[in-house]
Amino acid sequence: SWPNRDRFVLSAGHGSILVYSLLHLTGYDLSLEELKEFRQLGSRTPGHPEYGLTPGVETTTGPLGQGFANGVGLAIAERFLAATFNRPEFPIFDHYTYAIVSDGDLMEGISHEAASLAGHLGLDKLVNLYGDNEISIEGKAMITFTEDVPGRFRAYGWYVEEINGDDLEAIEHAIRSAQGETERPSLIVCHTHIAYGSPNKQDAAAAHGAPLGDEEVRRTKEKLDWPSEAKFWVPEEALMVFREAVENGQQTQTSLLNLVERYAAVYPDEAALLGRLWEG
């Protein structure tokens, strides 16, 4: 709810449980019991993220391509706010917009138009991670989708990097490279495996939009050296890492809000206008 936070858009909205899990781990008002109500009528963990229903969700997504365009719009908003209100000693708007996008998103016409505009405007604060697992609900994505996605985005004027999307260090390195861009939006092509670690369903269309099943889940956990019988279990050391990240984020938030207070003291008219815009 504070102005200069980074934005995150899950354009591939069908992967909503990823967002809900991270919101829970990072201390948002979303309990473990609510995660267990995933996709149930009346729950705060619906099958696609919904703005205003689940704390921490920036925008509703689901219709393919919509989230991609939402991300471009958010990046344009950051550019506008920075150009309007920033002063040399007060960079009160300099946040990033991150999005996870899918094959289905990039098939849709709206993503083509939005990507072209983002490249034209040079939205350097926009970083999209494209989950390229080469699978659709019908089978291999190549049945209907064979275009050169990296080449298309380079033609739009984007920075493009291709990585192993199952390698966390590679993802971090690519994001940092994208943050170094000052004139182009970024597309990180993450080559991944659907149902990663599943002995029988990895890289199979059967894992698209359907549960693995209890037995396959057990086998997958065993293959990944995870306690096979535990459900909704988070290792204590992992929880500590997330809690440390929350503390760091809170410190960053406090620092940036203090910057806005100092800005208001020096530029009261601009701060008043910003307040009116923020209140709608």
Set out the residue ranges of the language-model regions:
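Glycine-rich ThDP/TPP pyrophosphate-binding loop and its adjacent helix/strand module
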Residues: 53, 57-244
